[in-house]
Amino acid sequence: MEFQERKEKHDLRKEINSLLVTVGRVSKRQFLEYFADNKQEQVGYLLHQMVQTGEVCEPEEGVYLPDARFLDTSYYKTTKIHGSENVYADMQKYTGHLTQLQKKQQAFWVFLDFKKRMQAQDPVAIDSREFPFMLLAFFADGCIYEILEVMKGEESQLALLASKERYESITGQVRRIVIIDRMEQIEGLKRYQIHGIAGYVTVDADGKTCYQHP
């Protein structure tokens, strides 16, 4: 019995680490929703224990990152030539990375909605320098789902994606959920004719989602 409990904790710890590596920034509420079928007290205890041992970091109460170095601006310093520094470029990398972590956390709320409704497999990160607005992907009901985020004023980023896919043959069923700031963006986004848009969604600061079919 003791061996089984240790194994369960070990497996749960591995899953927590895996999610943090994939998403980058996950709240305690999100962990509890993800592990709704497990003992939630055990999840909370393990998170506390992993922070104490330094396996994960908790920069603010109830928010977890896989590595504290992401919060250190020195981690983003670029190689200097002849001793010169580009502080602006370094700070851009720092703020850009933290913004990307927040966007992936929003995308994880969307994934959790699908996990409740269907047998959605664990998400994978879409780490694309070319298309940084593409965040997470997962498989459910025989389809690949991709979660994108296009904020107000960033709509033109879709032009490159539309142009690239126009000359590619897209195989299989790909469905895309687009996170937006407000529903008024939808009409403007439609003109890019992005393949496979299955819906639009807003995500508030508390993780509440509101969907709109295309």
Question: Which functions belong to the PLM regions below?
Answer:
Residues 1-86:
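Nuclease-adjacent, charged terminal/linker segments that flank catalytic cores
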Residues 36-40, 100, 104, 179:
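Generic detection of long, well-ordered alpha-helical segments
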Residues 56, 123, 201-203:
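Assembly/interface hotspot detector across virion components, adhesins/toxins, and nucleic-acid enzymes
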Residues 60, 139-142, 151-152, 180-186:
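Short, flexible beta-strand-to-coil junctions
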Residues 63-64, 144, 208-209:
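Hydrophobic residues embedded in beta-strands of well-ordered beta-sheets
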Residues 68, 151, 213-214:
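Secondary-structure transition/turn motif
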Residues 89-172:
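Exposed, interaction-prone assembly regions rather than primary DNA-binding/catalytic cores
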Residues 157-214:
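C-terminal regulatory/effector modules of DNA-binding transcriptional regulators
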